[in-house]
Design a protein with these regions (language model features):
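Catalytic-domain carbohydrate-binding cleft regions of carbohydrate-active enzymes
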Residues: 1-396
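Accessory, solvent-exposed terminal regions and/or long lumenal/extracellular loops of proteins
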Residues: 349, 395-504
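A surface-exposed beta-strand-loop module
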Residues: 509-510
Length: 510
């Protein structure tokens, strides 16, 4: 509890990794075994001596997966997590929700659980175990929203406070490129929450100057920055992995290109929080998605039908992440897929110590979908849609565009999400056609919003009249601001109009 409290005092949250399997020395195992609620097949870790692959089976771990389809088993599982929740644990990292299933035999598939044979229910396992934790936490308290990150999912899992991450992926450009279609394909199943390990999980082959030195390797630095810029557009923005630490100061110091690029990306993410949180409300209330394949919104543009390197982030932002190296040589990576967890990264001739100059100006060519005009977010240059454009791509520049006919709310620079109230938001209007935006706010935690404790402010841009209408605020919630300021600006101009807003509708001519 002291550890959790110390994290909270630093204005951070804490998430713990929990698994759906138990070793024979644990209380959970004993209770589950007594009631016949363990599946009898090999799962991770197989060895009781080491995680090194292949496992040493002279001392098997005996770890077994619990029957998540049984209400009794789910209660036993939660009973041993409840104490952690009472201590203040904020979130659950539910790993191996597939679950890991090694050396499968016919009899393993035919064994019976609470809902039938393992063969008939295996794909449902992540849904069942995630749902169990969600329901137990909701019953325990309505004051903290359930947040679950899980390695696997099934249809409908979005109902239970869960998001999927793409697993322990390799730290390569090829793997970064694959994250984009992976996320889009996943979210098209109706599950909107997808994220990845920024920088990839296995970065060991970049440790060319000793253990943990990858953050000082030029090849890894460039990959990490570009991966972070892609991660900016995921619902969860998260750096994680093995083999080397990932804190910003591991990559250099303030004033150096890599450090500054990472800091700039993080600060932009926090500035986008009003847009992201309002999008989250559309996801929750209207069934929308954070990550939108381009054919959702531009179906008449055939070029978007199979585009796997660009997407919409919400309704207004076109994400065009840079997915190829521009300053260093691409690491060519080959592996035996069954080589084992700890051997996913192998040294090869492409890993080098390079003296890349990250201050050099670079350019990149991106496609702008037909059916809209687009503003470069960084320069606010306006481009016609339906063509390729070449834009600057310095290391610290996240490649992104905003659709003409958009309203983008931006928060002040913050160190953490609740450091400052949103009482002084910047509102950037991207003209060219009419636009609307619904600003959503609530208490930031708990489930009172399900009972109507939230507010919305609709903003409407009339492109012909050059007027922004900020409608009357609808709804209320405890702690809601009654007075605030909006700093309004047209993209491509520097003139700012600041207005005071007390919840009553106002018109602002630009």
């Amino acid at each position: 509890k002291m550890m959790i409290d110390s994290v909270h005092k630093q204005n951070a949250h804490i998430m713990i990794s929990i698994w759906a399997s138990f070793g024979p020395q644990t209380q959970q195992y004993a209770k589950l075994k007594e009631k016949g609620l363990l599946f009898d097949f090999e799962t991770w870790p197989q060895s009781g001596l080491s995680h090194i692959w292949p496992p040493r089976m002279d001392y098997p771990s005996g770890v077994k997966v619990y029957d998540a389809f049984s209400p009794v088993a789910r209660q036993i599982y939660w009973d041993h997590l409840k104490k952690l929740f009472d201590y203040g644990m904020d979130a659950w990292w539910m790993d191996s929700t597939d679950p890991d299933f090694f050396n499968a035999k016919k009899e393993h598939y035919e064994q019976k659980g609470a809902m039938g044979s393992w063969r008939s229910v295996r794909n449902l396992f992540p849904l069942a175990t995630v749902k169990g934790i969600y329901e137990k936490q909701r019953k325990a308290s309505e004051e903290k929203r359930v947040f679950i990150m899980t390695r696997s999912a099934f249809a409908g899992q979005q109902h239970y406070g869960s998001g999927l991450w793409s697993g322990d992926v390799a730290s390569t450009w090829d793997m970064l490129r694959k994250q984009v279609p992976a996320g889009l394909n996943y979210t098209m199943t109706g599950c909107p929450n997808f994220n990845t390990d920024i920088g990839g999980f296995f970065c060991g082959s970049y440790n060319t100057n000793g253990a943990g030195s990858a953050p000082r390797n030029k090849q890894y630095q460039e990959l990490y920055v570009r991966w972070m810029q892609y991660g900016l557009f995921c619902p969860v923005f998260r750096s994680h992995g093995a083999d080397a630490p990932r804190e910003i100061y591991q990559f250099g110091k303030k004033g150096e290109p890599v450090y500054d690029a990472i800091e700039k990306t993080i600060r932009l993410r926090y500035r986008l929080l009003p847009y992201l949180y309002s999008t989250a409300w559309q996801v929750t209330s209207q069934g929308e998605s954070y990550l939108r394949a381009l054919h959702y919104d531009f179906a008449s543009d055939r070029r978007t039908w199979d585009m796997a390197d660009e997407f919409m982030f919400g309704r207004s932002i076109l994400a065009t992440p840079i997915l190829n190296p521009q300053y260093t040589e691409e690491k060519i990576f080959r592996e035996d897929a069954m080589s084992g967890w700890e051997k996913k990264e192998l040294k090869d001739e492409k890993i080098k110590e390079l003296n890349a100059d990250f201050t050099e100006e670079k350019t990149v060519t991106k496609y702008l979908p037909k059916g809209a005009d687009w503003f470069d977010f960084n320069t606010e240059t306006l481009y016609r849609g339906g063509r390729d454009v070449t834009i600057p791509s310095a290391l610290d520049r996240t490649a992104m565009f905003v659709k003409a006919g958009s309203i983008l709310p931006l928060a002040p620079v913050m160190q953490y999400a609740t450091e400052k109230q949103w009482d002084n938001l910047d509102i950037v209007i991207y003209p060219g056609c009419n636009a609307t935006f619904l600003l959503y706010e609530d208490e930031g935690d708990n489930y009172n919003y399900e009972r109507g404790a939230y507010s919305t402010i609709e903003m409407k841009w009339d492109n012909k009249k050059r007027t922004l209408t900020i409608d009357s605020r609808k709804g209320n919630f405890p702690g809601m601001m009654t007075n605030r300021r909006f700093n309004i600006r047209l993209a491509g101009t520097e003139d700012v109009k600041t207005v005071n807003y007390n919840g009553t509708a106002i018109n602002v001519s630009m």
